[in-house]
């Protein structure tokens, strides 16, 4: 390695947002990544207690039944933690910031806007919003003062991470990360596995106790651990399961949490809806796009040399030239402010 590279820093070391980076910038976490410890304990604690109890019962009663139950619990727990890690440790779709506003982003003066902002250059005034065509619908995109760009459709600036993020759904404190374009499928799988694990532990805790002959209260007192685990999972499944059902509804209608609360697409025409099967195919079977930023790259030597990202190119990369078209001025379609 040259002495010049030794003096330079990588992008993750100078990134101005609040993310936490590990393994030399290979793992990207949110600023509240420490909350993962609580989530891990809430899932792992009951799962480990249940597994230990099943292992104990293998040598005491119904060994075949409890052996299969133990294997199922271990598999579900492993899957839940795998998807949790994949959700929390990857770039969710962070959009590169502009050091300056490129000419491609300066809209025509005919663009209608009631509010104008001054870029960091101080010499260029930009409208606060401009129109973008998405699948025949006009969508308003906002200018982000922090990132110095017009956000792509469905993008949002997360105040917790201080990044503009592609197809932003929400910032989840339980995983300590934004849920967005590049980790949403893993998040849904994590919720699904957690829900199944809750149901699994609840059902087999009670089935295991019911296999013991005698008064229910006597059996419960004799195996209090399984009783407590069953009650814990019964309460938990209403929260985790409800969230899982809600996100499957969002997938069916091709909405994000942010859009559902802000724009109520269930009462309006949704420009992104493609039908239930196509919506699921787009989420779970389409290739996850590569990150727009390689945080392990060397940071530019001269701050003025590099414009880290241009919204015109990002729109094409994120949505494809057939789906998105820049437009100046108003359209007759209903404009949705983004």
Curated annotation (Swiss-Prot):
Its EC number is 2.3.1.225. InterPro entries: Palmitoyltrfase_DHHC, PFA4/ZDH16/20/ERF2-like. The keyword Transferase applies. It comes from Arabidopsis thaliana. The active site is at residue 172. It is a multi-pass membrane protein. It comes from the Eukaryota. Belongs to the DHHC palmitoyltransferase family. Residues 319-338 are annotated as: Disordered. It is found in: Endosome membrane. It catalyses: L-cysteinyl-[protein] + hexadecanoyl-CoA = S-hexadecanoyl-L-cysteinyl-[protein] + CoA. Residues 320-338 have a biased composition (Basic and acidic residues). The chain crosses the membrane at residues 32-52, 68-88, 186-206, 225-245. One of its GO terms (cellular component) is endosome membrane. The DHHC domain is required for palmitoyltransferase activity. Keywords: Acyltransferase, Endosome, Lipoprotein, Membrane, Palmitate, Transferase, Transmembrane, Transmembrane helix. Palmitoyl acyltransferase. This is Probable protein S-acyltransferase 1.
């Amino acid at each position: 390695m040259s002495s010049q590279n030794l003096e330079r820093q990588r992008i993750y070391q100078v990134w101005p947002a609040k993310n936490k980076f590990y393994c030399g910038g290979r793992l990207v976490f949110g600023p509240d990544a420490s909350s993962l410890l609580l989530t891990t304990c809430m899932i792992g604690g009951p799962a480990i207690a249940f597994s230990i109890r099943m292992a104990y019962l293998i040598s005491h009663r119904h060994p075949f039944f409890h052996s299969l139950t133990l294997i199922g619990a271990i598999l579900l727990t492993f899957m839940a933690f795998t998807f949790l890690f994949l959700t929390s440790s990857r770039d969710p779709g962070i959009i590169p910031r502009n050091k300056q506003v490129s000419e491609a982003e300066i809209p025509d003066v005919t663009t209608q806007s009631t509010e104008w902002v001054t870029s960091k250059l101080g010499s260029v005034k930009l409208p606060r919003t401009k129109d973008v065509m998405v699948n025949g619908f006009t969508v308003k995109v906002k200018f982000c003062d922090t990132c110095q760009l017009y956000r792509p459709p469905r993008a949002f600036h997360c105040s917790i991470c201080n990044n503009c993020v592609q197809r932003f759904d929400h910032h989840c404190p339980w995983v300590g990360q934004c849920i967005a374009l590049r980790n949403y499928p893993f998040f849904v799988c994590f919720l699904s596995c957690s829900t199944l694990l809750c149901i699994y532990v609840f059902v087999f805790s009670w089935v295991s106790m019911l296999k013991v002959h005698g008064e229910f209260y006597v059996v419960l007192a004799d195996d209090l651990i399984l009783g407590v685990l069953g009650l814990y999972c019964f309460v938990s499944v209403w929260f985790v399961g409800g969230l899982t059902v809600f996100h499957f509804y969002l997938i069916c209608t091709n909405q994000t949490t942010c859009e559902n609360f802000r724009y109520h697409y269930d009462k309006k025409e949704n420009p992104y809806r493609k039908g239930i099967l196509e919506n699921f195919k787009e989420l779970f079977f389409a290739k996850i796009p590569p990150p727009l930023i390689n945080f392990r790259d060397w940071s530019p030597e001269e701050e003025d040399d590099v414009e880290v990202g241009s919204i015109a190119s990002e729109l094409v990369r994120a949505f494809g030239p057939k789906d998105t078209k820049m437009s100046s001025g108003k359209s007759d379609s209903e404009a949705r402010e983004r």
